[in-house]
Every structure is written in structure tokens, then in C-alpha cells.
Amino acid sequence: MPIGVPKVPYRMPGGQFTDWISIYDRLYRERIIFLGRDVDDEIANQIIAVMLYLDSEDPGKDIYLYINSPGGMVTSGLAIYDTMQHIKSDVVTICVGLAASMGSFLLAAGTKGKRMALPHSRIMIHQPSGGTRGQATDIEIEAREILRIRHQLNQIYANNTSQPLAKIEKDMDRDFFMSAQEAMEYGLIDRVIEERV
């Protein structure tokens, strides 16, 4: 039986009364965003909107993006990535559990020096996948686009990890799993959190 979204008490600054709000709304007020599902257009739009709002409120203050995601749509993930690069606020990324596929891409996209994972987290990189049906020309167009996106993602991973592009291409050819420590050595994150930040 699902428990739904938990509610927590919150009193607005200067307010007289306490309201019950969703735990995610409460976390947003502390500049914490939680990505705990597949990356799709809906969650991407929500994350982008919150990032833009928080950045406009206080552009010098860090935004925390906690990630426990198996990945998802490349275009949705790239929209979040572009927003992270666009805003003035540093984005601290923290893997809690799993950051796979587009989840690991966003983890590595955090501000350098502020990319972290909990000790028992798993991180996985791989090439993008896609599927299409139809006429041969449609399949050819889709294949060219997937190859273009794969090259783009490989280039960004190489920039964010300081790994040679050839190594990234080889490692991403199939699912490549890493522990938090291995991800740090690889350059996807900057540190493993052993104690509370």
C-alpha cells in the first residue's frame, strides 16, 4: 500500500500559524531538490522550474540536487543539464542509492568540487538507447540522431571527468557500474560522503 507524499509542519517566516506541506515543498524551501525516479519531461520541467526560481531568489547560494534515479529520457536530462549550466547558483549533486544512465550524467554535471555520493551508492554509465519502427529511411534518421547524441554525451562526460574521450567511448559501450569510490577515482564525483555534510 503506497503511503503517498508525506506532509510535514512548516511555519512561514514571520507567520503565526503552522501549515502542513509536502515534504518536497519543505525541502525546496531549503534549496534541496530530489530526483527519485526516471527522468522524463514532467520531472525535468519541475526540476528546471524549481532551479530557475531558487536561482532568481538567491543566485549566490548553492542548490542541492539529490539523485536516486535509474536514468531516463536523454532530451529531458539534457534540458536539466543545460539549466544547471545556465544558472548562477552552484549545483551540488549527491547520489543516494543509484545514479544510472541519465542519473549519472546529471550527477557528473554538478559544480566541480561539489559532486558527491553516499558510500554504498552505485553509479552506472552507458550509451544512449532508442528504438524506432517504420520505413528504412526513418530508422536511418533515428540511428544518425542516436549516434550524434552519443557523441555529445561522451564529449560532456569527458569534459566533466577529465577522462580521455576514447576511454569514455569504450566504457560507455555497455553498462559500466561503479561504486562511489570508483566513481570518485573515475572523476564522476569529487568525494564520497562518510559523514554528514
Curated annotation (Swiss-Prot):
One of its GO terms (cellular component) is endopeptidase Clp complex. GO terms for molecular function: ATP-dependent peptidase activity; ATPase binding; serine-type endopeptidase activity. PROSITE patterns: CLP_PROTEASE_HIS, CLP_PROTEASE_SER. Belongs to the peptidase S14 family. Fourteen ClpP subunits assemble into 2 heptameric rings which stack back to back to give a disk-like structure with a central cavity, resembling the structure of eukaryotic proteasomes. It comes from the Bacteria. Its main location: cytoplasm. This is Probable ATP-dependent Clp protease proteolytic subunit 3. PANTHER family: ATP-DEPENDENT CLP PROTEASE PROTEOLYTIC SUBUNIT (PTHR10381), ATP-DEPENDENT CLP PROTEASE PROTEOLYTIC SUBUNIT-RELATED PROTEIN 2, CHLOROPLASTIC (PTHR10381:SF46). The keyword Lipoprotein does not apply. It is found in: Cytoplasm. It catalyses: Hydrolysis of proteins to small peptides in the presence of ATP and magnesium. alpha-casein is the usual test substrate. In the absence of ATP, only oligopeptides shorter than five residues are hydrolyzed (such as succinyl-Leu-Tyr-|-NHMec, and Leu-Tyr-Leu-|-Tyr-Trp, in which cleavage of the -Tyr-|-Leu- and -Tyr-|-Trp bonds also occurs). The active site is at S101, H126. Cleaves peptides in various proteins in a process that requires ATP hydrolysis. Has a chymotrypsin-like activity. Plays a major role in the degradation of misfolded proteins. InterPro entries: ClpP, ClpP/crotonase-like_dom_sf, ClpP/TepA, ClpP_His_AS, ClpP_Ser_AS. SUPFAM superfamilies: ClpP/crotonase (SSF52096). Keywords: Cytoplasm, Hydrolase, Protease, Serine protease. Pfam families: CLP_protease. The gene is clpP3. Its EC number is 3.4.21.92. GO terms for biological process: protein quality control for misfolded or incompletely synthesized proteins. HAMAP family: ClpP.
